[in-house]
Structures are given as structure tokens and as C-alpha cells.
């Protein structure tokens, strides 16, 4: 999404997961819009600081209805392929230690085409997608998300990130999040 935000004149920023953290960061930056992959969407205008799925849907409809061809606007948005939120159960306190190990290993594992960020766990960005492994803020699990511009990119990124995870937690059982 970052390239699409830049093309529209915005300034994207990656930040820590958690609705209260995102809202606070939006206030610091005076950001008009913020969101998380979990679906929390925050609008500064007319509804500052609250996230509500119905409201976000209505605002999207309001915004695209201003256009001559709303379908063209929606069809122009970037498409991608992603996993649902995945979890790896851990012992109490283990997720943060594992995350630190992943962050330390990343520079020796990934080549120069991969950009690593340690703002919230380990996120590795490639030109065609990203992988994220972070400690949950609420439960003793690692949270994993993978996204690619194509199915092939998604599978490659997921395989590379899971291979890295295997180095710090051999035999890790990856399962769907229980939401």
C-alpha cells in the first residue's frame, strides 16, 4: 500500500500494532487516516480516534460516490494475496526473546533485495510483498502475516520467513489465529 499512498500524495508510516498505539501516533503526526491489517480503520475527519467497521464502510462509500465511475476507483486499488493471521504458541515470555533472535539473524539470512524493519517484531519487505513475525501484545504467541503481489510471491515469502523461524524455534507449529 505504501506506493499507492505515495502516488496519491500521502506519506505512509509503519508503526507498532495496537489500536491505542496507532491512534496516538496519528495524533502525533496529525495523520488523516490510519489502519491495521486486523481491520481497525481510523479517520481523523469527523470521527477522530474511533474505529468502527460500519462507519469505515460508509465513509468508503461516501468517498467513492464522489467519483464519476466508483468501480474504476476501486478497481485501480492494488491487489495482493495474503495469509490470514497465523499464530505460533509459545511459553510465557518466549515471543519477545524469539523476536529478538529473528531480528539478529535477518541480516545474515536475507539478501540486499530485502529491507528489514524492527519497529514491531521483524518485518521483511521485498519489491513483491512482505513477511511479518512479531510478538503478540496480549497472548504468548508469535503473530505471522505474509503478503505477495502474486500467489508465487506469497508462497516464496512465506517459505523464507518460516525457514527463518525454524532456525530459532525448531518444529514450531503454525496455526490459524483464534479470532
What spans do the regions from the language model cover?
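Phosphate-binding and adjacent anionic-ligand microenvironments
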Residues: 1-145, 150-179
